[in-house]
């Protein structure tokens, strides 16, 4: 073996020979800084626990969704469009996409309280998440909601339990009876919206759907003629309103 080849073999062997690990070379444990300790865990949101689940991709304005009128206090035109799209999707029981639309509205106008109300509406079957979103709406009442929007948010506060499955007094109650009482309070609060805004057909539509849902846990529909009258008022103003679902 010539000298040049011997040198190459020696270098090759040294490269693969296990090197001793000195104490000072060992990886030191990462010290947790104040900044890192405040960061959310992977997959979690800076905005709060309720945002950890649900849609991740941004919403888009979908064509041919129909149209409704739901004025809000936002000055952002696209936020307004996403609010109305979210309500259209609520009427169609398209809850995931509805939450996505309301989330997009909140991204465009973070202080818009009614956007968080919409997220709560889209999660009525998940009281913990609904309460998280509703608390976000309530925290923005003074600066992010007009009088009418405040009525919607305060009405929903009657329906969503304050601390789902944690209130000891509620545990002693019959769950169905508790839901019935909350639904009755919600319907009463929604009717107050119509007292002040008698032309608000979205309030009428939401009352109708809540009456239908609440009937399952004991809130009796005492007059189907009254329900039909509400629907007729809705369709008289908007024949294509999604309440026909």
Locations of the language-model features?
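N-terminal secretory signal peptides that target proteins for export/translocation
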Residues: 1-2
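N-terminal alpha-helical interaction modules that lie
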Residues: 24-241
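Sec/Tat signal peptide C-region and signal peptidase I cleavage site
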Residues: 19-22
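Extended, hydrophobic alpha-helical segments in both membrane/secreted and soluble proteins
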Residues: 243-245
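Bacterial N-terminal signal peptides
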Residues: 6-17
């Amino acid at each position: 073996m010539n000298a040049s080849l011997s040198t190459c073999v020696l270098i090759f062997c040294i490269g693969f020979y296990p090197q001793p690990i000195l104490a000072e070379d060992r990886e030191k444990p990462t010290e947790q800084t104040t900044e890192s300790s405040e960061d959310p865990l992977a997959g979690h949101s800076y905005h709060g626990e309720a945002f950890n689940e649900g849609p991740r991709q941004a919403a888009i304005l979908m064509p041919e969704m129909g149209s409704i009128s739901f004025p809000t206090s936002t000055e952002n035109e696209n936020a307004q469009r996403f609010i109305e799209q979210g309500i259209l999707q609520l009427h169609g029981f398209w809850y995931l996409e509805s939450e996505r639309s309301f989330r997009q509205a909140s991204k465009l106008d973070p202080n818009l309280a009614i956007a968080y109300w919409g997220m709560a509406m889209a999660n009525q079957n998940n009281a913990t998440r609904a309460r998280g979103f509703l608390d976000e709406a309530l925290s923005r009442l003074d600066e992010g909601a007009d009088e009418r929007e405040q009525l919607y948010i305060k009405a929903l506060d009657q329906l969503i339990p304050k601390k789902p499955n944690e209130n000891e007094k509620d545990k002693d109650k019959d769950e169905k009876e508790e839901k019935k009482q909350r639904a009755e309070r919600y319907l009463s609060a929604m009717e107050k919206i119509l007292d002040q805004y008698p032309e608000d057909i979205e309030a009428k539509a939401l009352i109708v759907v809540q009456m239908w849902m609440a009937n399952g846990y004991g809130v009796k529909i005492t007059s189907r003629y009254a329900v039909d009258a509400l629907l007729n008022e809705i369709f008289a103003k908007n024949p294509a309103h999604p309440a026909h679902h």
